[in-house]
């Protein structure tokens, strides 16, 4: 499933500190085209900080970030906007604007990056709503009128508004029941397959790691300690990794795998 001939995101020697606390220390990481990379680590290890740094939402002390072949520190403002428009982000709690409808939330990236008539934006937003499995009448609802699962899907629709190449997911299944989480996993795989997405997924969800990730990267002590396939994670002798994947809470099977997802992954 992973196209290793094409690296679309390369992080080299990234360091980030907040005051005296060194969060990331010369960290290196690659993401390949059309892969789903699961990103894990202890709480407070800097997983979300790295994602925010890649997105330009947090300042780095040093290092190089190359996205779609471009060093983001050396591109023009116009090129950076083009790169930003080719990335979609689903934040942990959705981050929908409460005063806007689902339709209006999805249109926000379109308004920022595109010059489109309102009618066309309405049509495109409705297509994204259907793409993530929401009913069309969800378009007129406000976030307060949605369930947790619907909020996740609406936020995902917004992340997909500009047909990105690279999708960032921050704890996408947190707060969902097992059935809803399994359906969300299935949706991510379907979107990767149909849209050719590359997915960077911060998660603590063992079921998601087992079910949909091509590779897993483990952050600890400010760097990538281990990265590889699920099988390689199970063979890893690192104490934290072994406890995570083989401890009492670890799942040895795919209990949340739906028939549709099983068929797609086979």
Label every PLM stretch briefly.
Residues 40-42:
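The feature captures the beta-strand-to-loop junction immediately N-terminal to the Walker
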Residues 142-146, 150:
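Conserved ABC ATPase signature
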Residues 167-170:
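Catalytic Walker B motif of ABC-type/P-loop ATPase nucleotide-binding domains
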Residues 161-165:
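A short, proline-enriched helix->beta-strand linker immediately N-terminal to the Walker B motif
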Residues 71, 118-137:
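Conserved ABC ATPase "signature" region
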Residues 55:
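Helix-to-loop junction immediately C-terminal to a conserved catalytic motif
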């Amino acid at each position: 499933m992973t196209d290793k001939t094409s690296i679309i995101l390369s992080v080299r020697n990234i360091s980030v500190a907040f005051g005296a606390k060194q969060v990331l220390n010369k960290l290196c990481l690659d993401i390949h085209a059309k892969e789903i990379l699961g990103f894990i680590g202890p709480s407070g290890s800097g997983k979300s900080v790295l994602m925010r740094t890649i997105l330009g939402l947090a300042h780095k002390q040093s290092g190089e970030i190359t996205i779609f072949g471009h060093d983001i520190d050396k591109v023009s403002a116009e090129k950076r906007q083009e790169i930003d428009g080719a990335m979609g982000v689903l934040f942990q709690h959705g981050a929908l604007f409460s005063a806007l409808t689902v339709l209006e939330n999805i249109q926000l990236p379109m308004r920022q990056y595109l010059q489109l008539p309102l009618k066309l934006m309405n049509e495109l937003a409705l297509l994204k709503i259907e793409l993530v499995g929401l009913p069309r009448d969800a378009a007129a609802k406000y976030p307060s009128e949605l369930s947790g699962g619907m909020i996740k899907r609406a936020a995902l629709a917004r992340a997909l508004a500009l047909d990105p190449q690279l999708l960032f997911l921050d704890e996408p299944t947190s707060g969902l029941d097992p059935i809803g989480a399994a359906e969300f996993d299935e949706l991510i795989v379907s979107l990767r397959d149909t849209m050719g997405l590359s997915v960077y997924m911060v998660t603590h969800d063992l079921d998601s790691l087992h079910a949909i990730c091509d590779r897993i990267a483990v952050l600890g002590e400010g760097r990538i300690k281990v990265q590889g396939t699920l099988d390689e994670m199970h063979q890893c002798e690192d104490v934290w990794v072994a406890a995570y994947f083989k401890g009492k809470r670890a799942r040895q099977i795919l209990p949340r795998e739906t028939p549709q997802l099983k068929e797609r992954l086979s």
